[in-house]
């Protein structure tokens, strides 16, 4: 029988690594609580139509990367490749953005894309999503950027990330620009890279995102999207930059930043780093003011961003910003297997009274000698011995494992006071 192994592109989080996730997740919650965002939990399976209508049928994600299947009823379902579409569906279905309501939400969970696995890019990956609905003004644009900035500062990596900004204008602006771009690229058709040629028919704006040097040289003299954007939207983008200057948030303008999802409008942004090679983007987002209406809801202003958790962890590890793991327990109990009904009751009472303590024991209840060896390896500060003699006399034995102190005896009814010191 062949050995069963993990699916390519998927990863186990081993016990030795889970503390890194717990550390990052605790920082995420700290920051989002500070800005009064509410957590929501979304299903990992949605109807395929949701992503066709939101992410876009011509996008690389929907056309090449989604995990699609039919259930036993013949319904076409998809493992979510991103979180925004599902969050919008949830908001519409539960009437959370009707009659002028506003919502500030966040979620964190696994997403799925069939991509070539490499460092920082996996077929199952965890994503933090932050979404806000019903806010029209610049203030919410600044707030969502400030949330990411605050998280990076809290993690000690703000000097290693760069905010890149662009404006995509309105849908009409993009249509007009797309026609101008196609007209410009016509004479260069044969010189474009293979992916860019495919995008000419499906999603021409994505050509701006090409990393191929030859294509970038062709684009150097192409029409600029900013020249096709309405005056009001251009002014709004300029004001956003001015406010970021006032907040002390460093940024640079990137006129080729277009994002790979069809639903973005107006402001788009990415946080990038030069520490992770080709997988440089760790956070990306923007406004998507038309998406709620496109999916059947009322016209609703919306903005959000997503952070790739694995990439952020890789960056933290590379920069030495993760805390050292501390698996050591505080107290190790050494028990007589013949008297477990009494001694286990004492241990459980202490766990209830002192929940902050990490308490362990040898559940095989070997000899006292073997239990002491395990106590030494556990990293515990003290070992508490409860054998037959201790039970008969009403005192627990206390052995200090990290200090050169003599063994003590403490009455059972004083153990909690002793451990609190």
UniProtKB/Swiss-Prot annotation:
This is Histidine--tRNA ligase. Pfam families: HGTP_anticodon, tRNA-synt_His. It is found in: Cytoplasm. GO terms for biological process: histidyl-tRNA aminoacylation. InterPro entries: aa-tRNA-synth_II, aa-tRNA-synth_II/BPL/LPL, Anticodon-bd, Anticodon-bd_dom_sf, His-tRNA-ligase, HisRS-like_core, HisRS/HisZ. Homodimer. The keyword rRNA-binding does not apply.
């Amino acid at each position: 029988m062949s050995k069963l192994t993990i699916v390519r592109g998927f990863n186990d989080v081993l016990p030795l690594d889970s503390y890194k996730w717990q550390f990052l997740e605790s920082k995420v919650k700290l920051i989002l609580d500070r800005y009064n965002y509410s957590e929501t939990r979304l299903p990992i399976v949605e109807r395929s139509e949701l992503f066709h209508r939101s992410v876009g049928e011509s996008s690389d994600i929907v056309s090449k990367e989604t995990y699609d299947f039919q259930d036993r009823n013949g319904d076409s379902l998809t493992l979510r490749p991103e979180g925004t579409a599902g969050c919008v569906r949830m908001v519409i279905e539960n009437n959370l953005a009707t009659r002028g309501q506003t919502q500030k939400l966040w979620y964190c969970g696994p997403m799925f894309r069939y991509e070539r696995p490499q460092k920082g890019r996996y077929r199952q990956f965890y994503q933090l999503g932050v979404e806000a609905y019903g806010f029209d003004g610049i203030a919410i644009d600044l707030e969502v950027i400030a949330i990411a900035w605050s998280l990076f500062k809290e993690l000690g990596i703000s000097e290693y990330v760069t905010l890149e900004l662009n404006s995509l204008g309105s849908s009409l602006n993009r249509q007009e620009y797309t026609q101008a771009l196609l007209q410009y690229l016509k004479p260069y058709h044969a010189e474009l890279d293979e992916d860019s040629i495919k995008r000419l028919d499906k999603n021409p704006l994505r050509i701006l995102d090409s990393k191929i040097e030859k294509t970038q040289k062709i684009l150097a003299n192409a029409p600029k999207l900013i020249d096709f954007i309405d005056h009001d939207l251009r002014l709004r983008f300029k004001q956003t930059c001015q406010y970021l200057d006032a907040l002390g948030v460093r940024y640079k303008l990137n006129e080729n930043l277009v994002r790979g999802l069809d639903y973005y409008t107006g402001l788009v942004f990415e946080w990038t780093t030069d520490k992770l090679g080709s997988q440089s983007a760790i956070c990306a987002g923007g406004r998507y003011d038309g998406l709620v209406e496109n999916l059947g809801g009322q016209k609703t202003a919306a903005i959000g961003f997503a952070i790739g958790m694995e990439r952020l962890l890789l960056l933290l590890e590379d920069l030495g910003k993760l805390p050292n793991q501390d698996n050591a327990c505080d107290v190790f109990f050494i028990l007589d297997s013949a008297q477990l009904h009494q001694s286990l009751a004492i241990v459980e009472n202490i766990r209830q009274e002192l929940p902050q303590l990490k308490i362990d024991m040898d559940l095989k209840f070997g000899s006292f000698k073997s239990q002491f060896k395990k106590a030494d390896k556990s990293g515990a500060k003290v070992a508490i011995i409860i054998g037959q003699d201790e039970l008969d006399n009403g005192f627990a034995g206390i052995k200090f494992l990290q200090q050169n102190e003599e063994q003590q005896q403490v009455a059972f009814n004083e153990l909690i006071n002793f451990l609190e010191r």
